[in-house]
Amino acid sequence: MNSVSDRFALFIDGPNLSATARALGFDIDFRRLLREFHGYGRLLRATYYTPVIEGQENPLITWLDQNGYTVVTKATKEFVDASGRRKIKKSVNVELAVDAMDLAGYMDRMVLFSGDGGLRSLVQAVQRRGVRVTLVSTVASQPPMIAAELRRQADVFVDLRELRPRISRDPS
């Protein structure tokens, strides 16, 4: 993937990664995922972004926070759209983008776990600062879990199914 002297950070769009793994038929073992990337260079930070419903316990968030991940949460917001339907706003893209731009001057590579095409501008912005972007998602599902324009923008694309044997949770 890169030189062992590269400084890099993991940016994980939690809901997107979970949906992608589910589409491929497995669950992520986050301990194994972190171990997988430790040998790829100097890991500056592994950040997991997720929306939360206030007052609701989430054991995964607690575990991640205690096991080497920085966890960034954002409270979901309910609103009524133009057609009068109730919707829940649950995107963490802004938080992820702000953190990535803050770290851009300190990292050589960004590893982004997401397929959200809304992050293409972020990828372009960090690339302009000299950061190489590795994108992790999948094209193996129907429909693909990654926006085509995001995949084309990345310097390297890694299909999550290739990582499955090394990062999937044991079914026990």
Give residue ranges: language-model regions:
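Short, charged, intrinsically disordered terminal tails
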Residues: 1-3, 165-172
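Short, structured coil segments at secondary-structure junctions
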Residues: 67, 129, 150-153
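Short, well-ordered beta-strand core segments
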Residues: 70, 110, 157-158
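Active-site histidine-anchored catalytic micro-motif
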Residues: 105-148
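Short loop/turn motifs at secondary-structure junctions
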Residues: 42-44, 106, 153
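Domain-level signal for Mg2+-assisted phosphodiester chemistry and nucleotide/NA-binding surfaces
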Residues: 1-92, 102, 132, 138-142
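Short glycine-/acidic-enriched loop or helix-start segments at secondary-structure transitions
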Residues: 21-22, 58, 122-123, 145, ...
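Structural recognition of alpha->loop->beta junctions
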Residues: 97-101, 144-169
